[in-house]
């Protein structure tokens, strides 16, 4: 009798341990929350004034690849890229936004010849490893153009036109080593005064 009770107690204890382990596993590793599909909006890059001055002094003129746009705002350049798709968390702003168009830098070699450096299909990745990337070269290789500092990013939500919107702003963009090397190689007169490229803002319309 005692032997049967002992075996039953042991079985119940073992079942309790297994159940507890399973519950802990579910609590420790919950499934990741998926971001919401992005159906529109825009990514903007506002160059820092010192960077804008370095471009001007170095004889480099910024331009855009349609459907992106470019505007002079005070002593800075504002690139605007329409968002084509992606996925963002409405709560944290973490995710990925793909845009159309691109940016071009032109530099004069002689009175009649110019050199260009272009980047298209920009993508902003926010979150733990935040970067701004673009496609460059005949092989269509994607390169990191800038690393993004998300430590002071301002994430806000709003509603307009029957859609939810997420804005991720105040994100400093630091020029990547690859982009810096490309710029100084193609445009020898260009000498960036700092690695900070500018500030990136993502305003995304969610599905």
Q: Where do the language-model regions lie?
A:
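N-terminal segment immediately downstream of the Sec signal-peptide cleavage site
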Residues: 33-94, 170-207
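Bacterial N-terminal signal peptides that target proteins for export
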Residues: 2-17
């Amino acid at each position: 009798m005692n032997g049967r009770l002992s075996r039953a107690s042991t079985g119940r204890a073992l079942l309790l341990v297994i159940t507890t382990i399973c519950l802990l596993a579910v609590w420790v590793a919950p499934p990741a929350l998926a971001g919401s599909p992005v159906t529109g909006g825009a990514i903007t890059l506002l160059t820092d004034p010192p960077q804008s001055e370095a471009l001007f002094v170095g004889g480099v003129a910024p331009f855009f690849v349609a459907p992106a746009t470019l505007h002079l705002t005070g002593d800075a350049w504002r690139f605007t890229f329409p968002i084509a798709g992606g996925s963002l968390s409405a709560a944290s702003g973490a995710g990925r936004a793909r845009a159309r168009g691109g940016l071009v830098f032109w530099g004069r070699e002689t009175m009649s010849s110019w050199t260009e450096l272009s980047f298209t299909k920009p993508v902003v990745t926010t979150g733990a490893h935040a970067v701004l990337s673009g496609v460059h070269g005949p092989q269509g290789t994607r390169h990191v153009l800038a690393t993004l500092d998300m430590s002071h990013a301002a994430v806000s939500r709003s509603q307009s036109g029957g859609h939810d919107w997420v804005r991720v702003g105040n994100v400093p963009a630091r020029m990547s080593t690859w982009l810096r090397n490309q710029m100084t190689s193609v445009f020898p007169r260009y000498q960036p005064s700092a690695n900070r490229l500018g500030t990136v803002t993502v305003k995304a319309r969610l599905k």
